[in-house]
């Protein structure tokens, strides 16, 4: 009932808005949005209530989120010009990938701190701190992409490298030698290129053309360092 | 000639007429909302007025740039756009600055010719990051190559080198410019004629001067000690020359003793950085890796290890 009373008032206040804005009078232009905001939250709440997730089973909720994550994985593995990865971002996929990568990079024996590969925390810090730095860099360069969208893309695009890590661990089960290393090198280079192609397909359009290289270079460095960590991994 | 003068005169008249017609309040409010528009308007205005008064083109250019710089520093310290002004560069500009740092010439001032009152933090930050990671990666690769030549060396990835390289490079690229900037500010108080660079410009000079070390570090992968030293000396010479040529116009006004001391300290610190990189990351056989094999393996490998000892001493 309250909405029914307020909604006729809404078009009445909306029509003089451009007229007052033209005058650029501060006192009036401040008045109008206040009146507008009274009605809008009520409506959105009502609309939200119809498609509420409160009544559905927990299984449905989890399955829907897992499906969203899986769909984004498919987008990374087959990068197209599509903004699904950008529109509804989440950080579940990056978290899963990062933890998987860090767990697989963990060496079996943590002997001495000085003589070994990256520890779990170091991988975690490199991935998240690197992604945040790249995102800040692209924002500072004037990119029109939101902070979490960029984090989401960078995190999801680790997927090929996580796959490379899995293959490397399997290859390392075989006897060591130059052939073994060559296979790992090939896999890591291919997956590295894949990560770069996928992430630039999503991120490059957010920058003006004369700054695209400046925004893409840090991404290249980021995936290069992760690839290097994967390639030099030896289980012992 | 006369027609050209008339043209410019008309242009000015038009501009003043336009200014007179448009109310002041409206233009200021608009420039507050849309920064690019205000930016353009100021640049045109200052260029015109200075062009009329000063005959020298460079003077007006400089004045316009100064004006531009003042315009840029309008946003407050806590706003995001304040930091965006430090990353306001294009790809071509960054490449031009890198080229300028790679090819120093006497009398060719890096700040005057390449930064042009618009220092950026993109270059210093990412050059430092690249250098740190390249140092760590190549430092590991030398070990791998050493293992290839001599299978008795046990290689394992040394991730701590990333941390060491990152901390040392970033500390050098930020603390030394800070000290230099502070020193020059102090000297300015003593000698009034000096016009020192701003802190950002000093950071920029140092950041871009480190770029030469990236190809040098990659070339250090060649396991020939004398070649490594030649590459090191070449890169150090280029980098230090760029620094000296850029700093010389500032310290020239100071007393001869202070100028010489300052420049030699700058070059010495740069040489220390290069030497430190060489000795820490490019030992062909670090002592940490020599210690474990005797404990694990038996006597024959221990004997096989001893011929490598002179090799490790040779480059260092």
Curated annotation (Swiss-Prot), chain A:
GO biological process terms on file: endoplasmic reticulum to Golgi vesicle-mediated transport; intestinal epithelial cell development
Cellular component GO terms held in the UniProt record: cis-Golgi network; COPII-coated ER to Golgi transport vesicle; endoplasmic reticulum; Golgi medial cisterna; Golgi membrane; Golgi trans cisterna; trans-Golgi network
Source domain of life: Eukaryota
Keyword DNA repair: no
Lumenal topological segments: 106-115, 168-184, 234-236
Compartments it resides in: Golgi apparatus membrane
Record-listed Phosphoserine modification sites: 7
Keyword field: Acetylation, Golgi apparatus, Membrane, Phosphoprotein, Transmembrane, Transmembrane helix
A Pfam family matched in the record: Yip1
TM region positions: 85-105, 116-136, 147-167, 185-205, 213-233
Membrane topology reported for the UniProt record: Multi-pass membrane protein
Residues that bear N-acetylalanine: 2
GO terms of molecular function: identical protein binding
Cytoplasmic side, ranges: 2-84, 137-146, 206-212
Function per UniProt: May be required for stable YIPF1 and YIPF2 protein expression.
Subunit structure: Predominantly interacts with YIPF1 or YIPF2, but may also form a ternary complex with YIPF1 and YIPF2. This interaction may stabilize YIPF1 and YIPF2.
Family: Belongs to the YIP1 family.
Entry protein name: Protein YIPF6
Gene expressing this chain: YIPF6
């Amino acid at each position: 009932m309250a909405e029914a009373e307020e909604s006729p008032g809404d078009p009445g206040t909306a029509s003089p808005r451009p007229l007052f804005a033209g005058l650029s009078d501060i006192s009036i232009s401040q008045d109008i949005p206040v009146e507008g905001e009274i009605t809008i939250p009520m409506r959105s709440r009502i609309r939200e209530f119809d498609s509420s997730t409160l009544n559905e089973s927990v299984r449905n909720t989890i399955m829907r989120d897992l499906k969203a994550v899986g769909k984004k994985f498919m987008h990374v593995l087959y990068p197209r010009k599509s903004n699904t990865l950008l529109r509804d971002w989440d950080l579940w996929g990056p978290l899963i990938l990062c933890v998987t990568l860090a767990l697989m990079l963990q060496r079996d024996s943590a002997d001495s701190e000085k003589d070994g590969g990256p520890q779990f925390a170091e991988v975690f810090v490199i991935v998240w701190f690197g992604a945040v730095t790249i995102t800040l860099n692209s924002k500072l360069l004037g990119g029109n992409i939101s902070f979490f969208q960029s984090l989401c893309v960078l995190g999801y695009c680790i997927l090929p490298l996580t796959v490379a890590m899995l293959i490397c661990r399997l290859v390392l089960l075989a006897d060591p030698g130059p052939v073994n290393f060559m296979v790992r090198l090939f896999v890591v280079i291919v997956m590295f290129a894949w990560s770069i192609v996928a992430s630039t397909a999503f991120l490059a359009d957010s920058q003006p053309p004369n700054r695209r290289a400046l925004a893409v270079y840090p991404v290249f460095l980021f995936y290069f360092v992760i690839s290097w960590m994967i390639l030099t991994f030896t289980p012992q | 000639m006369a027609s050209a003068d008339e043209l410019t005169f008309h242009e000015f008249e038009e501009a003043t007429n336009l200014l007179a017609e448009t109310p002041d309040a409206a233009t200021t409010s608009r420039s507050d909302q849309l920064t690019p528009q205000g930016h353009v308007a100021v640049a045109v205005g200052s260029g015109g007025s200075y062009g009329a008064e000063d005959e020298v083109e460079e003077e007006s250019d400089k004045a316009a740039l100064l004006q531009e710089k003042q315009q840029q520093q309008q946003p407050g310290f806590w706003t995001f756009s304040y930091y965006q002004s430090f990353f306001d560069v294009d790809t071509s500009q960054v490449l031009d600055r890198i080229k300028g740092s790679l090819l120093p010439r006497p009398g060719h001032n890096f700040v005057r010719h390449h930064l042009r009152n618009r220092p950026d933090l993109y270059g210093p930050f990412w050059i430092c990051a690249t250098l740190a990671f390249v140092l760590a990666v190549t430092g590991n690769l030398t070990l791998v190559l050493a293992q290839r030549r001599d299978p008795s060396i046990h290689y394992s990835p040394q991730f701590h080198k990333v941390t060491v390289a990152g901390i040392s490079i970033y500390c050098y690229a930020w603390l030394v410019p800070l000290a230099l900037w502070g020193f020059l500010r102090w000297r300015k108080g003593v000698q009034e004629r000096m016009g020192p660079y701003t802190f950002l410009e000093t950071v920029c000079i140092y950041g871009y001067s480190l770029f030469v070390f990236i190809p040098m570090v990659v070339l250090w992968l060649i396991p020939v000690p004398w070649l490594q030293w030649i590459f090191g000396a070449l890169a150090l010479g280029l980098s230090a020359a760029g620094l000296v040529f850029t700093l010389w116009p500032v310290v020239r006004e100071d007393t001869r003793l202070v100028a010489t001391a300052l420049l030699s300290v700058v070059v010495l610190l740069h040489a220390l950085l290069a030497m430190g990189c060489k000795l820490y990351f490019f030992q062909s056989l670090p002592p940490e890796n020599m210690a474990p094999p005797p404990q694990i393996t038996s006597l024959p490998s221990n004997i096989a290890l001893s011929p490598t000892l002179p090799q490790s001493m040779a480059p260092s």
